[in-house]
């Protein structure tokens, strides 16, 4: 399996809070999916975890998940920069106009050509990227929840 999955911030919270969600990604890892996230997702997740109750447990578990699932952490590159800028300049979908962090996470997934973007954010799932991106070789990954990924992708490859 050469497909790649990008994990958004809420996915880490779901996996820490509910074992059944972590099991989905464990199966994906075992099936050969490459699992990625970005330094921006980790920064957002770490900050939110640090500000919440039981911060040490959450942050420790987050780092354990990175190791357990062999998650590759993506860093900014020229494509991320261009995509972030273009999403701000060519906004066609007002659902995300006040969500630069979410657009940044999506830009990472697109810049690194992830096949799937996993999130629980319904606006991000429905978000439409600027049409011009296709002309420069970037496409929105198939964006879905963990459960939808399990039902529509993972269960069909097992």
Where are these regions (language model features)?
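Active-site neighborhoods of divalent-metal-dependent phosphate/nucleic-acid chemistry enzymes
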Residues: 72-126
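Acidic, PIN/NYN-like endoribonuclease modules and their adjacent C-terminal/linker elements
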Residues: 2, 95, 112-158
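A generic structural signal for short hydrophobic patches within well-formed alpha-helices
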Residues: 12, 42, 124-125
